From Swiss-Prot:
UniProt-listed Gene3D superfamilies: Ribosomal protein L13 (3.90.1180.10)
The gene coding this protein: rplM
Protein name per UniProt: Large ribosomal subunit protein uL13
UniProt record, GO biological process: negative regulation of translation; translation
InterPro entries documented for this protein: Ribosomal_uL13, Ribosomal_uL13_bac-type, Ribosomal_uL13_CS, Ribosomal_uL13_sf
Length: 142
């Protein structure tokens, strides 16, 4: 019997909506990253994007444990000398709560073109309203 390999054109992708309210950031991000990769499916193939679409709502209500809300720092660099910027978790969650979840999930995906394709299937929104109702996403409990 030959080993099964999923073909990109035959992969069936579902849409799921995840409510981030009260969820721990890391535990939420690991489950989302696993679903984006397709590791929950029996036809998972490492070199093929077999994952589903994930819509995350209530991103501003995600929580972190311990003193991370004040101690966790996000760094970015412009590429120019002295161009490093930093922002704390508290300030980032107030300014752009979507970026907190996006950054956590992106760090858990492969760092290659396939990982970038997987990342594009993640949709994160600030409130409880999202524009993907036409796709009829199923609720995913994490």
């Amino acid at each position: 019997m030959k080993t099964f390999t999923a073909k990109p054109e035959t992969v069936k992708r579902d849409w799921y909506v995840v409510d981030a309210a009260g969820q721990t950031l890391g535990r939420l991000a690991t489950e989302i990253a696993s679903r984006l990769r397709g590791k929950h499916k029996p036809e998972y193939t490492p070199h093929v994007d077999t994952g589903d679409y994930i819509v995350v709502i209530n991103a501003e209500q995600v929580r972190v444990t311990g003193a991370k809300s004040s101690d966790k720092i996000y760094y970015s660099h412009s590429g120019f000398p002295g161009g490093i910027k930093s922002i704390s978790f508290e300030k980032l969650i107030a300014k752009a709560p979507e970026r907190v979840i996006e950054t956590a999930v992106k760090g858990m995906l492969p760092k290659n073109p396939l990982g970038r394709d997987m990342y594009r299937k993640l949709k994160v929104y600030k409130g409880a309203v999202h524009p993907h109702t036409a796709q009829q996403p199923q609720e995913l409990k994490i």
